[in-house]
Amino acid sequence: MNQRIRRARNIDKVMTVIFYAIAVFFFVLLAAFAGKVIIGGFAGATPEMFAFARKGSIGNQLFNTIYLVFISLVVSAPIGIFAGIYLAMYAKQGFMTKFLRICIETLSSLPSIVVGRFGYLVFLVMMGLGKSLLAGALSVSILTLPLITTTTEDAIKGLPAGYTQASLGLGATKWQTIFHVLLPACVPRIMTGIILAAGRGFGEAAVLLYTTGSGSSLRWGNWDLSSPTCPLNIFRPAETLSIQIWNLQTNGQDRALANLASAVLMLLVLAFSIGANVWSRRLAKKTAGDEK
């Protein structure tokens, strides 16, 4: 008996060491990759590369990237959250619900180049939007919508049944229970889905090749929303950081600028993820009554 216990403890120690070694390996691998991209990107950078110029800089592309992801989340986040609520709270088990879930899973696994082609045919050819920020954002929202939907559904279903039962028992309606009890409790997990969706939007290139174009000529003193050089005009062509990296690498142009754009894009995703996580945790504490 003692020998079996000793053997089990030895196996436990060995497995613990193995798991720690795997964790350290992946941490070192991630740190090395991020360090290589960031250090290599800023090593050859010059102050002019950070300007908001038409060529030879990343300022306009950085703004276009943030603006496009913001527009895509404005479209996909509300629709995805409401779709997740419907699937978790209202959808009845049956053929249509199963078919809807299969469609969502299929949509989430579609190659981005296929979605880009679809966006080109629908938003550019059929709707006549032309290559623009709006067409790109709508196409990216197609990719991010399934992720937000499934995250919201899983978050609501993962809550204890007592949340719903207690709220309904106190006289709240189903709608009040969802918005005042369930959703606040799901904020961290829903934000995780939105963060992942935003991360995919930041890095998309194949979709945007068909839909946004490569224009980055902006006039920062021009706030006429109908002007093609107005930064806030959603109907203008817009080159994002990922498209800029692709153009520079494939055309063999300024490699230092491409490296800088890669480093800035990685830092942008990292900063957004950290900021959104901190904000969602603070919001979760406030809704739970831990903070005043």
Where are these regions (language model features)?
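Transmembrane alpha-helical segments of polytopic membrane transport and secretion proteins
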Residues: M1-I22, V278-K292
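Periplasmic/extracellular loop-to-transmembrane helix junction in inner-membrane transport proteins
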Residues: N2-I18, K36-V74, Q244-R255
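Transmembrane-helix boundary motif in ABC transporter permease subunits
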Residues: S72-I104, R117, A276-K285
